[in-house]
Amino acid sequence: MAKKSSIEKNNRRKRMTGNAAAKRARLKTIIADKTKPMEERFAATLKLAEMPRNSSATRIRNRCELTGRPRSNYRKTKLSRIALRDLGSRGLVPGLVKSSW
């Protein structure tokens, strides 16, 4: 089980990303638009740099929904390999069958 503070920190980052996504996208389009004057694009760059780092989507870590484990996660199920194997062996994941040949 991961530390509760790490899980909560990641949840806070998810919330901040959701709140600031529209503003961040608007600033990025201004920066990328070459038809706008250089001063306006530079001002947008400064505003983007002033925004909190945790409002960026790249700061979010994929974690297991059950255990909070940060590594070896399957995106489709949002579970770590350990949790997926445990739930799969108990028959709690639909469509997952233990392999035998």
Curated annotation (Swiss-Prot):
SUPFAM superfamilies: Glucocorticoid receptor-like (DNA-binding domain) (SSF57716)
Region annotated Disordered, chain positions: 1-23
Entry keyword annotation includes Thylakoid: no
InterPro entries documented for this protein: Ribosomal_uS14 (IPR001209), Ribosomal_uS14_bac/plastid (IPR023036)
Record keyword RNA-binding present: yes
Gene Ontology cellular component annotations, sorted alphabetically: cytoplasm; small ribosomal subunit
Cysteine pairs bridged by disulfides in the record: none
MF annotations from Gene Ontology: rRNA binding; structural constituent of ribosome
Database matches in Pfam families: Ribosomal_S14
Keywords assigned: Ribonucleoprotein, Ribosomal protein, RNA-binding, rRNA-binding
Highest taxon in the source lineage: Bacteria
Residue spans of biased composition, Basic and acidic residues class: 1-10
GO biological process: translation
PANTHER family: 30S RIBOSOMAL PROTEIN S14 (PTHR19836), SMALL RIBOSOMAL SUBUNIT PROTEIN US14M (PTHR19836:SF19)
Subunit structure comment from the entry: Part of the 30S ribosomal subunit. Contacts proteins S3 and S10.
Function: Binds 16S rRNA, required for the assembly of 30S particles and may also be responsible for determining the conformation of the 16S rRNA at the A site.
Family stated for the protein in its record: Belongs to the universal ribosomal protein uS14 family.
Protein name as annotated: Small ribosomal subunit protein uS14
Species assigned in the record: Nitrobacter hamburgensis (strain DSM 10229 / NCIMB 13809 / X14)
